[in-house]
C-alpha cells in the first residue's frame, strides 16, 4: 500500500513543484 502512495507522490509532486517554482 505504501509503495503505491510513494510512487504516486513521486510522479505528482514534481509537477506541483514545477508549477509553483516555474522551473520545468
From Swiss-Prot:
GO cellular-component term (any): extracellular region
Single Gene Ontology BP term?
Answer: defense response to bacterium
Disulfide pairs? 18-24
From the Swiss-Prot or TrEMBL record, state where the protein is found: Secreted
Pfam families reported in the protein's UniProt record: Antimicrobial_1 (PF08018)
Tissue specificity statement from the Swiss-Prot or TrEMBL entry: Expressed by the skin glands.
Keywords per UniProt:
Amphibian defense peptide, Antibiotic, Antimicrobial, Disulfide bond, Secreted
Q: Which protein family is it in?
A: Belongs to the frog skin active peptide (FSAP) family. Brevinin subfamily.
**Function in brief:** Antibacterial activity against Gram-negative bacterium E.coli.
For this entry, the protein name equals Brevinin-1Sb
- Its source organism is Lithobates sphenocephalus
Amino acid at each position: 500500500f505504501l509503495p503505491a502512495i510513494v510512487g504516486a507522490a513521486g510522479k505528482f509532486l514534481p509537477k506541483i513543484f514545477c508549477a509553483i517554482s516555474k522551473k520545468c
